[in-house]
A protein has these predicted regions:
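C-terminal partner/receptor-binding element of secreted or periplasmic proteins
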Residues: 105-106, 111-135
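Sequence contexts marking disulfide-bonded cysteines in secreted/extracellular proteins
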Residues: 26, 53-55, 134
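Extracytoplasmic/periplasmic, Sec-exported soluble proteins
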Residues: 35-46, 109, 113-117
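Post-signal-peptide N-terminal segment of Sec-exported extracytoplasmic proteins
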Residues: 41-81
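Bacterial Sec signal peptide processing site at the extreme N-terminus
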Residues: 19-39
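Sec-dependent bacterial lipoprotein signal peptides
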Residues: 1-25
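Mid-chain, structured segments of secreted extracytoplasmic proteins
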Residues: 77-112
Length: 135
């Protein structure tokens, strides 16, 4: 019996080593990133980046009279971005876009949402909230 074990011991050790190496090569399960990316803060970060690029950096005339004022660090759990008058940033916001919860519940309100541009704002915000990058 000892002889049998001695003759197969190197094979068994090699097999164990191969199994351990194979297990180490397997991809580790990744945590679901979709739940994190659908939370309020990451959603509002995407919206702020999209709004800045498409509405302001591009020189879009529809947003020329406004300035973007992100308020993403919110202790209330409602990160938001504001559109304020360009020459009077301390004035009341003309548009508030905010999110809350996980998955994020979006809300957009203010005087600008009563103007013709409101449909475009709603479409853009939904696209960016869902991960779209375009304008």
């Amino acid at each position: 019996m000892k002889r049998l074990l001695r003759s197969h011991a190197p094979k068994a050790a090699g097999l164990l080593l191969a199994a351990a190496a194979l297990a180490a090569c397997q991809p580790k399960p990744q945590p679901a990133s979709s739940s994190a990316s659908r939370a309020a803060l990451p959603t509002m970060e995407r919206i702020a980046l999209g709004a800045n690029a498409c509405w302001f950096k591009s020189g879009d005339p529809a947003f020329k009279a406004y300035r973007l004022a992100p308020e993403l660090n919110s202790f209330s759990g409602r990160p938001r971005i504001l559109l304020v008058p360009r020459n009077s940033p301390e004035s009341r916001p003309m548009l508030v876009i905010q999110a809350e919860g996980n998955p994020a519940k979006l809300d957009a309100f203010g005087p600008v949402m009563n103007e013709a541009i409101s449909g475009r704002i709603a479409t853009d915000v939904k696209r960016w909230a869902n991960g779209g990058k375009g304008c």
